[in-house]
Amino acid sequence: MSIEVGSKLQGKITGITNFGAFVELPGGSTGLVHISEVADNYVKDINDHLKVGDQVEVKVINVEKDGKIGLSIKKAKDRPQARPRNDFRPKESFEQKMNKFLKDSEDRLSSLKRNTESKRGGRGARRG
């Protein structure tokens, strides 16, 4: 059986290592699912996700000249397309942004002055 990049196949886990899992494909060939291609989240221990003998669906991601087959479990899963968000907000004009910035900076500056003056004990007067 010819194995083509991009095809989805059913396979059986035949071996697990610390860097991935070996999968026997239809036709007797074996490919490797790298640990980074097992799940969408971080996989610290592959044994938490796979066991020898498990049936898995894999996607062929590469076939090298020396016959090595790279597989992915996470790319074989059909994920629903993310819908584009419809966050339409009218753009603020430059003047609106500038007015908002000036108001915010005035508020911050006045509160900073208030806090500084209260720590000094009033309008800069020193205590005797």
UniProtKB/Swiss-Prot annotation:
Record Pfam families: S1 (PF00575)
Compositional bias segments (type: Basic and acidic residues): 78-120
A Gene Ontology molecular function term of the record: nucleic acid binding
Domain S1 motif, residue spans: 6-74
Region Disordered, residue ranges: 72-128
InterPro entries the UniProt entry points to: NA-bd_OB-fold, Ribos_protein_bS1-like, S1_domain
Entry's family note: Belongs to the peptidase U57 family.
Name assigned to this protein: Uncharacterized protein YabR
Protein's gene: yabR
